[in-house]
Amino acid sequence: MSSKSSIQNIFKLSIPIFFANLVIPFVAIVDTGLMGNLDNASYLVATSIAASVFSILFGSFGFLRSGTVGMIAQADGSKDYEEIINIFLRNIAFVIIISLLLIILQTYIYNFSLSIFELSQETKLYFNDYFTFRIYSSFGELTIFVITGLFIGLQKTKTSSLIVGFYSIATVSYTHLTLPTRLMV
């Protein structure tokens, strides 16, 4: 492979990943924007803080994507397709365990998050609503890491980017469609 075609291949693989990484904070930004258009600033404050908490929390599991990429790429290079399936299933099982632990530990995560910020009672109520919504989305959020790692490891970065984009749009749509009913509780 020539140096020029090698560089072209790198760009071909990396550009979709670059754009997918731009989409990842999209959900928190849009949720914050939706809350900012409501008549009460407490919505905006609560969503912004909770979005930051979950950016840090879910970001700490980025190893799921990078670890999946490395293992899948090795198995793909060896043409060991059974191992690719096994790696994917093991990582999904790990995601299930992590998600269940996050749900079990949600009270501690919630209380720790609130101990960092001084919030009014009203803001705490809205923080609780968004926090609960996001903690139960843990499985989906972390599964996306494994799925994108799978496709990046198989050098199908466009597919990986499309999945991230679709998931982000679906999450934003869900928030937009359910926002009025969730705030009236």
What are the language-model segments listed below?
Residues 1-14, 72-139, 173, 177-183:
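Short alpha-helical transmembrane segments in multi-pass integral membrane proteins
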Residues 7-26, 53-60, 136, 162:
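Residue-level signal for short hydrophobic patches within transmembrane helices
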Residues 25-45, 114-121, 177:
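Helix-terminus/linker motif at the lipid-water interface of multi-pass membrane proteins
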Residues 29, 146-150, 173:
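Alpha-helical transmembrane segments of multipass membrane proteins
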Residues 44-104, 141-155, 159-160:
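Small-residue-rich hydrophobic transmembrane alpha-helices
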Residues 166-170:
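Transmembrane alpha-helical core residues of multi-pass small-molecule transporters
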